[in-house]
Amino acid sequence: MKIIKLDENNIPDIARIEHECFVHPWSEQSIMNAIRAGHTFFGCEKDSVLYGFAGVNIVCGECYVDNVAVSEKYRGSGIGKALMTELISYCKMKNADFVTLEVRCSNKSAIALYESLGFECTGIRPKFYSSPTEDAKIFKLITNK
């Protein structure tokens, strides 16, 4: 498997994984709008099949992780860590001060991944998610050390 930078040609595959992983997935149009607005997406692929992706938006030296998703069959195989590692390297290359993201409080595996990469919980967003309603943990990684 390899990590690649995604573009508009990958939108159907990104949308497929969005629909596999999220109750409220981004539409193909939303993904296209994000790419055209300058958001950067990385994917993990093998034999031209996309197994996961991570998206980030950088504004004024701040990186906001849009989404990280891995097809259910491939979770726990290191794809999420590889994607996040690439995303963090990209943010550092862009001289970002930090990377931030939100995650459902119940998503223990994602929380463990983010903590293993050096992210720290900086707060809670009450009732941030719906279906079901749930708080989000806010994580931040300082990248300008």
State where each predicted segment sits.
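Acetyl-CoA-dependent GNAT
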Residues: 2-73, 84-86, 90, 94, ...
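Conserved hydrophobic beta-strand within the GNAT/NAT acetyltransferase core sheet
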Residues: 65, 99-103
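Active-site acidic-Proline motif in GNAT/NAT acetyltransferases
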Residues: 71-77, 105-106
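Conserved catalytic-core motifs of GNAT/GCN5-like acyltransferases
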Residues: 102, 115, 120-135
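Terminal substrate-recognition subdomain of acyl/acetyltransferases
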Residues: 135-145
